[in-house]
Amino acid sequence: MGDSLLADRRALVTGATGFTGSHLAHALRAKGYHVRALVRDPDGANAKRLAEGGIELIQGDIGDAEAIDQAVARMTHVFHIAAVYRTANHSDAYYERINRDAVGYVLEAANRHGVERIVHCSTCGVHGDVAEIPANEETAFNPGDVYQRSKLAGEMLAQEAARAGAPVSIVRPTGIYGPGDDRFLKLFRTVENGTFRVFGKGDIAYHLTYIDDMVDGLILAGEHPAAIGEVFLIGDDSYTTLDGLVAEVARAVGVKPPSLHLPVVPLMLAATACEFACRPFGIDPPLHRRRVAFFTKARAFSVDKAKDRLGFQPKVPLADGIARTAEWYRQEGWLKGSGKTAA
């Protein structure tokens, strides 16, 4: 599809060198948008791939208000995807600067330059450990760590701007996965080599979103008239359990799923000790409490609002998405198995 169809639509994507942002930038370009990406290092491999796809690069840091202002200039759409995710060696102030303050810079610049549509990417994590499932957009906030708290603070700025009349839409994704992302690689590898262990009962709810569906949801939030001023959870049609997720991964890598379940309390104690031991040295600990949350925190959400108001329809079921992800890992040389299902 050429530029002629949407030649008047110019979209800035922040976080475009990351997993979700890169997929979104290429999808918008394929739709005919002129796409601009704010990147720290134009010579980096991810930035070069964007440029090869016809995406304009502008150098700058998401924590720099002046750089954001320059990037937003002459844009009709802004998709704010950039964030600092869960790593244990960043200070709380760093999370706040990137996940909260930068949102304010984006909103101010968008207002100053008359941007037509703004999509702010938040997280389902603002709801924390969900007590009643499936949760929805009205479920109480319950952030459980500095990442979730800082993302909630950023979302509050976006909600405030929307109440003041800014053309803002807010998306809260469930866990995003798919080819191009390595966050779930450790899970796939340890399931394949037989070293993965389930801590706890394995019956906690787990909700994912395949990357293509996530991109569809973000674009709908930036184009559909009914999205303005609204918040939408975006995810798969249905959720699973941790045991269900592990079983799908095992099927995709051709092994039997683990049957042993270990108590989670000793793991949490070890994570706490590891975190405190590493922090004075600025080391990212191999085990920390946020990783233990993988086994303990329920994540299950309704996406009915996005389906009803935006026409959002997830297209890639979990089994297909996990299989595609495993195949990509295999092509990258990160998995050893053939992918044939174990007998």
Q: PLM ranges: what are they?
A:
Residues 149, 153, 181-186, 199-222, ...:
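Substrate-positioning beta->alpha
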Residues 128, 166-185:
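Flexible, glycine-rich beta-alpha linker
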Residues 104-147, 169:
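Conserved Rossmann-fold NAD(P)-dependent oxidoreductase catalytic core, especially the SDR/UDP-sugar
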